[in-house]
Amino acid sequence: MKPILNKIAIIAGLSLLASCQSFFDEDPVYSTTTDTFFNSETALETYAIGFLESHLPSAATLTRGDQYSDICVTTQTEGFLKTGGYSAQQANNWARGNWRPLYNVNYYLKHMKDAAPYVDDATMKHYEGVGRFWRAWFYWDKVKTFGDVPWYDEPIDPDDDEQLYKGRDPRDYVMQKVLEDLDFAATWCSKASKYVNTNVINRYVALALKSRICLYEGTWRKYHGLDGSEEWLRACVAASEELMGDSPYSLVSTAGEETTNYSKVFKSEEPQYTEVILANEFNATLNRFHDASWYYASGSYGQRNSGPKAFVNMYLNLDGTRFTDKDGSNKTQFKDEFAGRDYRLRQTFITPYYVKKVGGKETNEFAKVFPGLTTQLTYYRIIKWNTDDDANESNTSSANSLPVFRYAEILLNEAEAKAELGEMDQTVWNKTIRPLRERSGVIGAMPATADPYLASYYDGVTDKWILECRRERSIELYMENTRRDDLMRWRMGHKLTVEFAGIHIPELGKPFDMNGDGKNDLCFYSKSHPKSGSNQTGVSYVEVTAEEGDNVTTYSVNKDNCLVYILDREWADYKYLYPVPKNALDINPNLRPQNPGWDD
């Protein structure tokens, strides 16, 4: 909301966010002294709002944090997935700046107590909960990345060599500390009206983070063979059910608007607080913009992010049946494969139904709204974060607010935790998966059997409930910075190397109609299947450099005559954790041993 955005702008404008010289002796997040600053609730609020500005995930993280995953095709891959492309010498995220957020939080938690004579106990506990919320999030991110990490719950004295050069604490110890912080925040952060739907940390936000982290840790432990999985999954259920049972949140779902219910959550400037629990807010009036529309529309600025066919196939039919149960489903033409499908599909990718503003006027004209290969790679062009206006596709001018936590995720967390515990039933289904599907026009009936398509994709997982939870999560939270984490916790890192197939090509060398308007739009051809005759007006011609089996570096065609983008990637199981950077090990040998599989 504007009041919070105004306060953030004021804090930034006054340069209250200090630059830091050293991780261990830096100034706190604000240029102030504790003797005079922490003497009122206003001081606590100001400091807490500063955390929102400095710690909240950025627009880039929220909208494209999942671009290097199995369900997004990019022009290039990251070094981490290249053969020989990543090592301890190249590793990062252990420098002073990476630990600075922890110092700032611990400084705040230590010195905020100076406000106790001026602030009532409930308010003090609320703001302590805010600090512990951010510390929990910080450490969860560090554990996801490195596994064992040193735990610090106070700012470090620069003369304390024992603390400066301590070793890494075990994952279990650190995560128990994280859970303590989460429990405190979820208990003592306030749910008073002045904190709710004002985009600040409150009890519901704390419960949302607890739900997310506990699901991650519970399933990580289950699939990576560690003890304690059930404890974490039950903590996820407890947090999710508290939020589901005692909060003002629900799904954005209006009867008769199934084709737009989903997209409303992502395309509006004012956060959709019916569903959104916390957002990174943007606002045109305050000149607060991001670049998501530009990134996804530009072939040079972005990575030409696109959806792979294997993912598009996961979307159900509106009658609740599986698209992939139909014989030849993988050979369905683009113009036909969206009819009668989950309406989230057309709200996530450009389809023949897509309408956007071009030159200030809304149009569905195919040549104007559908991009060529210069801006995407598979012809499943992502529009989830786009404002559907070409005025925002060549600059940083998007002002749609971006959800950080939303109620839909809580339903998904509850469903998956219950499924992993073996406790999914019709009651749980009807409270979680069913409403998510029904708001986008899909009949929400429970599955009678496990989906063989998903069982094959997820390498033999046969539990029908777990498979449906994974389907729903991948669709509902697509490109919301959750997929990479999901693959890591499910021990499915090898899916990062899946084939990146695109649309089905009816016949090489022959133009075809993409959108069903009776006009040919596109023609793929190759050396062995050349285009026939002269080029047709209005048809884009794309050369496929070879067919399946040939040594190619760009595009191929697979056995189902689907376009395939060639992108070499490599996975090894030691990559479930990143290496501790070599320079950090050299400075502090007590951080050894290095994570398994990585050389120093």
Task: For the regions a language model picked out, list residue spans one by one.
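Sec-dependent bacterial lipoprotein signal peptides
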Residues: 1-18
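Long, intrinsically disordered, low-complexity segments
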Residues: 20, 98-101, 177-179, 258, ...
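An aromatic- and glycine-enriched ligand-binding surface/loop that stacks and positions planar moieties
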Residues: 21-79, 149, 175, 182-184, ...
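Conserved, well-structured interaction surfaces
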Residues: 41-46, 50-55, 78-146, 162-176, ...
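Flexible, polar/acidic helix-loop-strand segments at domain edges
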Residues: 332-407, 595-599
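Active/binding-pocket-proximal capping segment
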Residues: 408-412, 424-453
